[in-house]
């Protein structure tokens, strides 16, 4: 039963990534602006000043985080299905990179948005970071 639950979570989260990529820039920008304004107020209250474009930084951090979450879901799903680590490593990294490429491809068709190789690398670095953290965690348990 847990196998199916992890697989459903993985598929649902991946679809959510693709859904967010299909949003026009106006909708995506509005969400980012609201989040940046809220975070900016929190930082002001805490006495922390941020130089530069907080919205841009927040968008990039959200991409990294989303792909890190997906990387964790990929690792856990393959673990639940008892796929050998060596094979699972390849599958996790390949599927993480594939998701990043497809995500940017979808985004290229969304109004007001573009795709960039740098974004694929940023997205994949989230997957790679979580995969590495997961493997270190697994190794430390033995």
Language-model features and meaning:
Residues 1-2, 79-87:
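Membrane-interface helix-boundary motifs at transmembrane edges
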Residues 2, 59-62, 91-96, 119-123:
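Alpha-helical transmembrane segments of multi-pass integral membrane proteins
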Residues 12-17, 88-108:
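Small-polar-interrupted transmembrane alpha-helices in polytopic inner-membrane proteins
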Residues 25-29, 79-82, 108, 112, ...:
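Transmembrane helix-loop junctions in multipass membrane proteins, especially transporters and channels
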Residues 100-124:
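Interfacial helix-loop-helix junctions of multi-pass membrane proteins
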């Amino acid at each position: 039963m847990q196998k199916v639950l992890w697989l459903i979570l993985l598929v649902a989260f991946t679809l959510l990534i693709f859904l967010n990529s299909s949003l026009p820039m106006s909708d995506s920008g509005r969400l980012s602006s609201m989040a940046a304004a809220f975070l900016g107020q929190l930082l002001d209250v805490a006495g922390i000043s941020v130089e530069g474009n907080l919205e841009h930084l927040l968008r990039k951090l959200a991409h990294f985080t989303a792909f890190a979450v997906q990387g964790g879901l990929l690792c856990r799903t393959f673990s639940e299905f008892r796929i050998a680590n060596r094979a699972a490593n390849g599958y996790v990294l390949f599927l993480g990179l594939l998701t990043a490429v497809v995500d940017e491809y979808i985004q290229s068709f969304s109004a007001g948005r573009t795709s960039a190789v740098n974004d694929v690398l940023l997205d994949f670095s989230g997957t790679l970071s979580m995969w590495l953290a997961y493997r270190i965690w697994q190794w430390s348990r033995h």
